[in-house]
């Protein structure tokens, strides 16, 4: 058995849009309304009616942090979530020094890993 020590990935590019829900903008939100803050890659749900507060980055009295957007579920440290797309999924990670790669909870026909060096 080989044990892989995970590294924190906070940013990458992907062909999957972050359009799970409308983007948060200042305003009044109804109970159970969901929105995203793309800069955080998070989905929030309003916990009260006529909610005028902004999501705080965590669950508070006004907003529940539901989880990562579809595009970022792949790195949310939860095996039970999946990034889903009809067709190919492409991820491009910044320069990493790594000797191992793991794909967990994956349903696909094939996986292609391409390692590139920029000159």
Regions found by a protein language model. Name each.
Residues 11, 15-18, 38-39, 68-119:
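Aromatic, loop-rich ligand-recognition surfaces of beta-strand-rich domains
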